[in-house]
């Protein structure tokens, strides 16, 4: 998908063109194609890793020991031969395809024409823009450059100590010196806002799922499946509901970053030693007291890993969101990747990397300190 930024042919370039022209039916078909390819390769690699060796009696013929390999090769050769005589087996042309892009477009338009859908999407768009995105964006852009650097340095010192604070100061000073500070702040705004909202929605969901083994397994399965999907796939439903707006970008990143938040929160809560929760029960603690005073504090190092991954995913997703048009570093990178402005490309890339590394180092340092404090 990323190669579509530099004009490489393939499904990525086709998807980019369809999304920019708002042809959601064809976009959905291309997206499903990429997802199926990704899921197939993912499941194949997992099956290969967990496959146990088979043992046969001495003297078993080679073809019996490798029966499925022989069967697969025979099937491959059979279709290679027969495809020379039946053209549709050689390649399914676009005229013979089972495309339902127009029908899907019709279904989407019909769904969006329901009054309750219009009212809901309009309210969400209005609420996010008026009460979340615009105020926080203006506030961040209003703060002077060195005010932001000082704030980041202070946050890094509070969570990680002197080394993360020094690294944060150096990295954000470099970002300021590179000349794309306003776009960097828009990128930071989208990232932090999305991750904050992903925790706001993801934490209650994870806490609920962590209560039982069955719910935990089901939620982890959903997270595994969601992580298999290419990142851009989350843009499609957001575009369908909210059009090409800043709200679309925030909601797509929110859904994408909820996966590590939910996964690591569940793992952290389920990983609390049973004897500690039993001690809390014996002391007469209520469910909420046990959660806030025992389980969450002990799970925080693992939850911090989820926060770290969510931030990294969000910075990555902001760049992907340039497919539908943004005003941040991703948009500038999309404009220059297909050209010969290598210096500008490196400058923009380093700006994103330095911001991401700042938070990565600070969060990891805090998680390590927390583990030592808890004796984990």
Show which residues each predicted segment covers:
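Transmembrane alpha-helices
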Residues: 1-3, 25, 29, 34, ...
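Hydrophobic transmembrane alpha-helices
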Residues: 2-5, 36-40, 174, 196-200, ...
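Hydrophobic alpha-helical transmembrane segments of polytopic membrane proteins
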Residues: 11-48, 235, 329-367
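Membrane-spanning helices that line or support transport/gating and their immediate boundary helices
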Residues: 14, 43-51, 183, 187, ...
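Alpha-helical membrane-interface segments at transmembrane helix boundaries
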Residues: 16, 133-141, 181-189, 193, ...
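N-terminal, non-cleaved signal-anchor transmembrane helix
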Residues: 43-189, 363-376
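Cytoplasmic-entry segments and transmembrane alpha-helices of multi-pass inner-membrane transporters
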Residues: 168, 176-238, 264-267
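Membrane-cytosol interface at the C-terminal ends of specific transmembrane alpha-helices
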Residues: 213-221, 225, 229, 234, ...
């Amino acid at each position: 998908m990323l190669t579509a930024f530099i004009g490489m042919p393939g499904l990525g370039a086709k998807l980019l063109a369809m999304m920019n022209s708002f042809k959601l039916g064809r976009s959905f078909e291309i997206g499903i194609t990429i997802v199926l390819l990704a899921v197939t390769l993912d499941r194949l690699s997992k099956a290969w890793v967990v496959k146990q060796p088979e043992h046969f009696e001495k003297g078993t013929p080679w073809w019996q020991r490798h029966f499925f390999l022989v069967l697969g090769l025979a099937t491959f050769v059979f279709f290679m031969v027969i495809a020379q005589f039946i053209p549709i087996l050689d390649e399914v042309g676009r005229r013979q395809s089972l495309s339902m892009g127009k029908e899907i477009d019709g279904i989407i338009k019909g769904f969006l024409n329901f009054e309750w859908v219009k009212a809901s999407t309009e309210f969400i768009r209005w609420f996010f823009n008026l009460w979340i995105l615009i105020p926080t964006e203006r506030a961040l852009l209003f703060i002077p450059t060195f005010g932001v650097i000082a704030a980041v340095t202070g946050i890094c010192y509070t969570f990680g100590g002197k080394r993360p604070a020094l690294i944060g100061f150096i990295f954000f000073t470099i970002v300021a010196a590179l000349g794309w500070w306003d776009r960097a702040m828009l990128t930071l705004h989208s990232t932090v806002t999305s991750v904050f909202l992903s925790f706001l929605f993801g934490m209650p969901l994870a806490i609920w799922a962590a209560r039982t083994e069955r719910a935990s397994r089901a939620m982890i399965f959903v997270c595994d499946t969601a992580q298999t999907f290419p990142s851009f796939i989350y843009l499609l439903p957001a575009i369908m509901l909210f059009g090409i707006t800043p709200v679309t970008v925030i909601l797509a990143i929110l859904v994408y970053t909820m996966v590590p938040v939910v996964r690591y929160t569940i793992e952290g809560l389920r990983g609390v030693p049973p004897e500690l929760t039993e001690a809390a029960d014996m002391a007469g603690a209520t469910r909420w007291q046990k959660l806030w005073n025992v389980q969450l504090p002990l799970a925080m190092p693992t939850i911090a890993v989820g926060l770290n991954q969510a931030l990294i995913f969000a910075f990555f997703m902001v760049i992907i969101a340039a497919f539908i048009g943004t005003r941040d570093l991703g948009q500038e990178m999309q404009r220059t990747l297909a050209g010969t402005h290598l210096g500008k490309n490196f400058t923009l890339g380093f700006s994103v990397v330095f911001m991401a590394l700042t938070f990565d180092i600070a969060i990891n340092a805090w998680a390590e300190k927390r583990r030592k404090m808890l004796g984990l």
